[in-house]
Amino acid sequence: MIPDVSQALAWLEKHPQALKGIQRGLERETLRVNADGTQATTGHPEALGSALTHKWITTDFAEALLEFITPVDGDIEHMLTFMRDLHRYTARNMGDERMWPLSMPCYIAEGQDIELAQYGTSNTGRFKTLYREGLKNRYGALMQTISGVHYNFSLPMAFWQAKCCDISGTDAKEKISAGYFRVIRNYYRFGWVIPYLFGASPAICSSFLQGKPTSLPFEKTECGMYYLPYATSLRLSDLGYTNKSQSNLGITFNDLYEYVAGLKQAIKTPSEEYAKIGIEKDGKRLQINSNVLQIENELYAPIRPKRVTRSGESPSDALLRGGIEYIEVRSLDINPFSPIGVDEQQVRFLDLFMVWCALADAPEMSSSELACTRVNWNRVILEGRKPGLTLGIGCETAQFPLPQVGKDLFRDLKRVAQTLDSINGGKAYQKVCDELVACFDNPDLTFSARILRSMIDTGIGGTGKAFAEAYRNLLREEPLEILREEDFVAEREASERRQQEMETADTEPFAVWLEKHA
């Protein structure tokens, strides 16, 4: 089932320097909660400055949903320590609140008024909050409080230069983008390995179902927790953050211009369903517009092609201007076993898997095959640890045992690991392969199995509160390592100044400004 990568691996072993200079970055979301696990109702902590303009700490959907962002980094240890510093400083500056250590929220009901993230009075800030109002009215606020980790990854120019392209040539943008689309297609075909190993949301609190019927065969504990015994990541299931209305958009990942055209089409396509919500009610705006996507960011995807945008530029226009610059992997649940929600083993695994995806052959993929890849993902998400589970290739009928496919993949990853270790020194990547491959013979080693054991004992709430308390105490005690207290104070002041400048510079009324941007 795994493509034959032997020639590409042999090429890599002859050109190990092509992997020198991999760059990556991390984003981690987490809900601020009170000691009893309920969602915090306070505003964004003052010490963290402006959520609109802060370089490292912002908010996602809700005012209580923190998001930590590391700068682009070539050093894994440095990146993780930077992320830990962001958590340490925040833990010391959020009073008695703590960070929820799980992807799925618990003590939270749909009817509860979840305050949307607030970004001040500038037109840009108000637009961001209005976008969130639209998300709430379209999908419900509860779904939007699910949190995850995003891993951003780029291969060095030396890789593309050696592999395919004269990077000074006029078609370099297209060729490098084609290389990243190959990564994306392979990710759709084989990325289910990520929830298999690292999915950590096998259960949900009963409030999450909101009394709606579900066809999933949930088992229920006395404390009202619903779980599937072999599930890995309910966050990635239809219960979690997915968007059914987008499934027939027909966006494909074969070509830069085709992809951008599909995205631009979706933000112009009217939706009957969202038109029913209305645009305004009693003088209050309910969504930016009633199209299938209000803006491009609303496209739900487990992986995204990205380029850093310039001021006022849309993500797709940035891609058209310069091609794909990096890939954003969006399928990681919060790692409950790490105080910062992600660890070195996961980052090293993703490095290996992304390199493998760049090497493995990836035939073009129609929108119907893209839909077929969802079958494998759903199997792994809902019953990934089930004995005898099989997976298929695209829309073909042949089936292969998951443990065998996993071990075949790791045979290739081990060779990538040897190459990466040869240029970095040590055996860190090979060690990760040896640790993780064991999960295919023994699913009890996976994150989902480990966290489910705890949840069955103490419930999601009990598990979440215990980890949150332990991590709060740990992070508050640890000294900063890379950033200093004064760096945070300076960034707080600078972010507040930047927000102030944006608000002062806006002369156009929001309603007029919005007509141009909606």
From Swiss-Prot:
Pathway field: Sulfur metabolism; glutathione biosynthesis; glutathione from L-cysteine and L-glutamate: step 1/2
Keywords: ATP-binding, Glutathione biosynthesis, Ligase, Nucleotide-binding
Coiled-coil regions listed: none
Record GO terms (molecular function): ATP binding; glutamate-cysteine ligase activity; metal ion binding
EC number, UniProt record: 6.3.2.2
UniProt-listed InterPro entries: Gln_synth/guanido_kin_cat_dom, Glu_cys_ligase, Glut_cys_ligase
One cellular component (GO) term of this entry: cytosol
A GO BP entry: glutathione biosynthetic process
SUPFAM superfamilies on file: Glutamine synthetase/guanido kinase
Catalytic reaction equation(s): L-cysteine + L-glutamate + ATP = gamma-L-glutamyl-L-cysteine + ADP + phosphate + H(+)
Protein family membership: Belongs to the glutamate--cysteine ligase type 1 family. Type 1 subfamily.
PANTHER family, per the entry: GLUTAMATE--CYSTEINE LIGASE
Annotated HAMAP family: Glu_cys_ligase
Protein name: Glutamate--cysteine ligase
Species the sequence originates in: Shigella boydii serotype 4 (strain Sb227)
